[in-house]
UniProtKB/Swiss-Prot annotation:
Keyword Cell membrane: no
One CC-aspect GO term: host cell nucleus
Transmembrane segments: none
Signal peptide bounds: none
UniProt name for this protein: Early E4 34 kDa protein
Length: 291
């Protein structure tokens, strides 16, 4: 496993080397071995190949302990050719374990894994270094969470705990928007009845994550970011409506989300470390009281 020690805080790469408009936009589906673009994450073949240091702006993904990356949304055609031909990478190849230390300071190290048949080979090591560099683009892009922290406040206003926006990253003119659907049944309903446009769904070990890709706000102007937030919120409200129509238990707004935003803002803006237990306190996925 290789570690890249060089790291730079830069906002400039946001608008450098923007990708052209995508002609074939994928749709979020419940992936199976037949229709999935990425191989299934199998713990029997999993082995770590690289390590990337995070920044405080990534803490929204750190608390989830996994970060799915739809590679087809941020890589060029040639890079996708290399990834498919010489690598065996699942969609959620970046994981982290924060339950041991319980302290989140924003500079945790993400472990990148692959599922190739020859772990430790020269090809595997080279792929690990390249994967680390590609993943670092997403880490750099997470600085948009610091620049537009209001995005989470707007999108998650009075939303239930079952559907929550968790963070964004901005890579090569593509804005990847992540939100978490707590229950498997709710995720199935959302994917079955709501059209999300260019999107991807990851059925992870710990979370159900839906990733939306927006290229309308590629210039990062205030008005376009506001329009993007409004569109994201409308899609989330559609998901909430679909879930409410097909379930018995009522959906109530999360009373813990504002406290979480205060913790995240203190870490992202002022580098105040937080405890993982404080972020997840009173979190009960089976409670109907909106926590």
């Amino acid at each position: 496993m290789q570690r890249d020690r060089r790291y730079r805080y830069r906002l400039a790469p946001y608008n450098k080397y923007q990708l052209p408009p995508c002609e074939e936009q994928s749709k979020a589906t419940l992936s199976t071995s037949e229709n999935s673009l990425w191989p299934e994450c199998n713990s029997l073949t999993l082995h770590n190949v690289s390590e990337v240091r995070g920044i405080p702006s990534c803490v929204g993904f750190t608390v989830l302990q996994e970060w799915p990356i739809p590679w087809d949304m941020i890589l060029t055609d040639y890079e996708m050719f290399i990834l498919k031909k010489y690598m065996s990478v699942c969609m959620c190849c970046a994981t982290i374990n924060v339950e041991v230390t319980q302290l989140l300071h924003g500079h945790e190290r993400w472990l990148i894994h692959c599922h190739c048949q020859r772990p430790g080979s020269l090809q595997c090591m080279s792929a690990g270094m390249l994967l680390g560099r590609w993943f670092k683009m997403a880490v750099y892009g997470a600085l948009i969470n610091k620049r537009c922290f209001w995005y989470r406040e707007v999108v998650n206003h009075l939303m239930p705990k079952e559907v929550m926006y968790v963070g964004s990253t901005f890579v090569r003119g593509r804005h990847l928007i992540y939100f978490k659907i707590m229950y498997d049944g709710h995720a199935w309903l959302a994917l079955e009845k709501v059209s999300f446009g260019w999107s991807a769904f990851n059925y992870g070990i710990l979370n159900n994550m839906l990733v939306l890709c927006c290229d309308y706000c590629k210039d990062l102007s205030e008005i376009r970011m506001r329009c993007c937030a409004r569109r994201t919120r409308l899609l989330m409200l559609k998901v909430v409506q679909v879930i409410a129509e097909n379930t018995v238990r009522p959906l109530k707004h999360s009373r813990h989300e504002r406290y979480r935003q205060q913790l995240l803002k203190g870490l992202i803006m002022h580098h105040r470390a937080i405890l993982f237990g404080d972020y997840n306190q009173r979190e009960n996925p089976w409670a109907a009281d909106g926590h």
